[in-house]
């Protein structure tokens, strides 16, 4: 059995058919009432191109769903910032497995959080974006997944 290899590639260098295949898959996952025909028409790709690439194209974070991810965050040293981050993760059914917080230096605390993502109600990409927008969070980075 041949093992599939994966590459992490910036979306802007991919051919249009592959980018649009990813768009169709995202559209279908967000709007399950759509048919493939309707989705490919909305995105502007042929059905044959979609079917050619659909089994090999998926968002980067999709492969991490149902897995354990590790995030590195820089948090302002203020009361309640870490608590808000943890409550936010819990609100979307992320299961926090470990937390490691270093002593704050220069008003910033480095925090590492491992999260089980299987039951999460948002994508990992959406989680990262939302966390990065939170007051008191200056950096969020996905540093590992297993």
UniProtKB/Swiss-Prot annotation:
Q: Which residues form the ACT domain?
A: 70-145
| Domain of life per record | Bacteria
Q: Which family, according to UniProt?
A: Belongs to the UPF0735 family.
Name by which UniProt lists this protein: UPF0735 ACT domain-containing protein CHY_1913
Tell me the classification of the organism that encodes this protein.
Bacteria, Bacillati, Bacillota, Clostridia, Thermoanaerobacterales
